[in-house]
Amino acid sequence: MSSILNILPALAFLLILLSISAYIQRTSKENRQKDFAKDYFIGGRTLGGFVLAMTTAATYSSVSTFVGGPGVAWVIGYGWLYMAIVQVVVIFLVLGVFGKKIALIAREIDAVTVIDVLRARYHSDFLANMAAVVIVAFFCATMVAQFVGAAKLFEAVTDFSYLTGLTMFGLIVVIYTTIGGFKGVAVTDACCAIAMIVGLCILMGGMMHAGGGFNKIMSYISTQHPDMLEPLSRGKMPISLYISQWLLVGICTLSLPQSVVRGISYKDTKALHNAMIIGTVVIGAMTLVATWIGVISKGILTGPITAYGNSVDNIMPIAIVQSLTPFWAGVIIIGPIAATISTVSSLLLSSSSSIVKDVYMNIKGKREEQLSNNQIRLYSLGATIILGLLVYAIAIKPPSVIWQINMFAFGGLETAFFWVLIFGLFWPKANKYGAIAAMGGGVIIYCLAMVFKIKVLDLHQIVLGIGLSLLCFFIGNSFGKTVDEKTLRIFFPEKFDDEK
């Protein structure tokens, strides 16, 4: 009986999200009858600043925010926290660099997805289809890993099995994403972001109490592990790791399609500006507090890593169990579950839009076979359900290499879209051959570098992927011509202002 009571907070939270999504489905019925694709995939471009900020922050945060990151901080110390500071500017970068421009372009060409924008800019179905394949492949790998990570944490903190946790939040997120669409995902993401912040605050209080207070914890760390107070952690946090992580989880994240699409969905400039401010504060609070909790947990889990299963992923689950009562541990589990489902819901919706909107509807359009609004609705809902259930099924018995595959995802998406978006939106001379070479060549190079553990100057493979992707872009671009003037007027209207 007590075990059931321990998971009631998490179950109640999931049911609230499901109810919100069902409510949004009902209130959006009229808009979906007019243009289902626009309302379902980007919420009809009606997001306000607060929801835009929270959904972007929640999408960026994942189960690693609660498990992997703090676990590494337990080993390295404040050096990992200093590295994590770069993540504070992530939302400011995404919305600041791409937000306004991509919103104006999307309204001009009636784009619903990032791939719509790329297709209109480069006039290449091959590039658009390649982008769709990249998105679906990497997103599915990420979603499986998110499910696996959260379910394992659920199993460690509660008395319930891995499958129970996976089923409880896995199926609910598939259902509420399917019925709520983008607007439902955005609003529930906002709820998830709030839940994550509250969970981190409770966990921080529990950690401090269990460790005897901040002064006692820091006294132990400074005496027993003084290296944890140093920026380089006596070699465990080299400069090359700082540079690699600042690129991987900082600068290059501005090109992640699941974040960029948020720039298509807001209602006005005021919402964008508010989101940049609110989002920066929220992502900063979540990332830095979570990482700091990992550092101070060293004062609670004082044994060697071999005492905790020889894995940093076990640190936070064990710390939660040792720091909190079963009930509060059940409340805390809402945080990582919220981080998981907010990420999965966004990736799931983006994946289904890539299949239905970017590939299938485009093929039909080329054949002059227009789909009815009802057909679009059925195909979109069907794709979301099928993808979601597929990810859930794989997560039940995940392949042993899934964590290695997940490592590809973040850097792979950045390598694929970084230069394609940057040059596409800010360099008039960029053409489809450069974009195809950068995306295809960059992803292949990055994946090969990851598989064979190839590094340059001990930097993460993202540096090699991004660097050679840039080279591929320039080489490919030299074989093509600049796009037509009509396209340039849409994407670079400032170049033609003198003619008015």
Set out the residue ranges of the language-model regions.
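Membrane-embedded helix-loop-helix hairpins and adjacent transmembrane boundary segments
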Residues: 1-500
